[in-house]
A protein has these predicted regions:
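Amphipathic, heptad-repeat alpha-helical segments
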Residues: 20-64
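Extracytoplasmic/periplasmic/luminal assembly and interaction segments
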Residues: 59-79
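Low-complexity, glycine/proline/serine-enriched intrinsically disordered segments
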Residues: 17-34, 93, 101-256
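N-terminal signal-anchor transmembrane alpha helix of single-pass membrane proteins
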Residues: 1-23
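Amphipathic alpha-helical coiled-coil segments
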Residues: 72-87, 97-109
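Short, charged, amphipathic alpha-helical segments
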Residues: 59-66, 85-93
C-alpha cells in the first residue's frame, strides 16, 4: 500500500513542478512580448510628438497615428497575456505606417522599413488612380496623397475583410472598423474601385470571404462541383465623408 502513496506523491510533485515551469514560461513570454510592444509604442510616440502636419493628408495621417499610439498604450497597460501584448504591438505598427504616410505627404524621407502588418500581404495596394461614382458622389483611390485623397490606409484586414493600401478621398473602411461589421453595399464600391486593378489581384468574392490575394493560391471550388453561395446584397450604405480623429497639437520636426 505504501508504494501507492509514493506514486501519488511523485505524481503530485511532478504536476506541481510542471505547472510552476509553465507559469514561469508564460510569465517570461508575457514579459518579452510587453518589452517588444513597449519599444514599438515608444518609437511611435516619439514621432507623433515630433512631427507637425503641413497639409490635409499629413494632418489626417498624424491624427490616425496619434489615435493608434493612445490605443496601443491602453492595450499594453491591460495586456495580461503575450497574445494581448502582441496585439498592442500590431496597433503601434499601424501607427508607424501612418507616420510613414504623413512623412510621405510632406515630401520627407519616409524612414526605415516597418514590419508587415497582419493581413497586409493579402490586401494588395492601389497602384493607379481611379475615381468612381458611388451613391451619387465621387470616390477616389490613388497610390499617392493629394488634396483629393488625404485619407491613408496601410493595407490589411478590417472586420475580417482585406482593404488595399492606398490613399482615398474618404475612409470607406472606417464604419466597419468602428462597428466590427461591413455593410452589404461595400462590395459594390469595392468592385467599382478595384476591379481590374493590377495591385489588387482578387475579386469581390475574395474580398467578401476575407481571403484576398490568398485566394489566388487556392483551388477553384467549381473544380470540385461546389457552389460557394455568396450573396453580396444591394444595401447602398454610406460613409459620411472624410473625418479623421482629432489628435491635438503636433509640435516640432524631427527624423524618423
Amino acid at each position: 500500500m505504501w508504494w501507492l502513496i509514493v506514486i501519488v506523491v511523485v505524481c503530485v510533485v511532478a504536476l506541481l513542478y510542471l505547472r510552476a515551469e509553465q507559469n514561469k514560461r508564460t510569465a517570461r513570454e508575457l514579459e518579452e512580448a510587453q518589452a517588444d510592444a513597449r519599444v514599438t509604442t515608444e518609437r511611435l510616440g516619439g514621432q507623433v510628438y515630433q512631427l507637425s502636419p503641413r497639409n490635409e493628408a499629413s494632418r489626417q495621417a498624424l491624427a490616425d497615428a496619434s489615435e493608434r499610439y493612445n490605443a496601443a498604450g491602453g492595450q499594453l497597460d491591460r495586456a495580461d497575456s503575450a497574445a494581448k501584448a502582441r496585439l498592442a504591438k500590431q496597433t503601434a505598427l499601424e501607427g508607424l505606417y501612418y507616420i510613414r504616410a504623413a512623412r510621405t505627404a510632406m515630401d520627407m524621407d519616409p524612414g526605415p522599413p516597418i514590419p508587415t502588418l497582419d493581413g497586409q500581404d493579402i490586401a494588395g495596394q492601389v497602384d493607379q488612380p481611379r475615381t468612381v461614382n458611388h451613391n451619387g458622389r465621387p470616390v477616389t483611390a490613388a497610390p499617392t496623397p493629394s488634396p483629393l485623397t488625404p485619407n491613408y490606409f496601410p493595407g490589411g484586414r478590417v472586420a475580417g475583410r482585406p482593404v488595399p493600401a492606398g490613399w482615398y478621398s474618404e475612409p470607406w473602411w472606417k464604419p466597419a472598423l468602428v462597428a466590427g461589421a461591413w455593410g452589404a453595399g461595400t462590395a459594390i464600391l469595392f468592385t467599382a474601385l478595384f476591379a481590374g486593378m493590377p495591385g489588387v489581384p482578387y475579386d469581390t468574392q475574395a474580398f467578401e470571404d476575407g481571403t484576398g490575394e490568398a485566394a489566388l493560391d487556392q483551388p477553384n471550388p467549381d473544380d470540385f462541383g461546389q457552389d460557394p453561395g455568396y450573396d453580396a446584397g444591394q444595401d447602398p450604405g454610406g460613409w459620411g465623408g472624410s473625418e479623421g480623429f482629432d489628435s491635438g497639437g503636433f509640435d516640432g520636426g524631427g527624423g524618423f
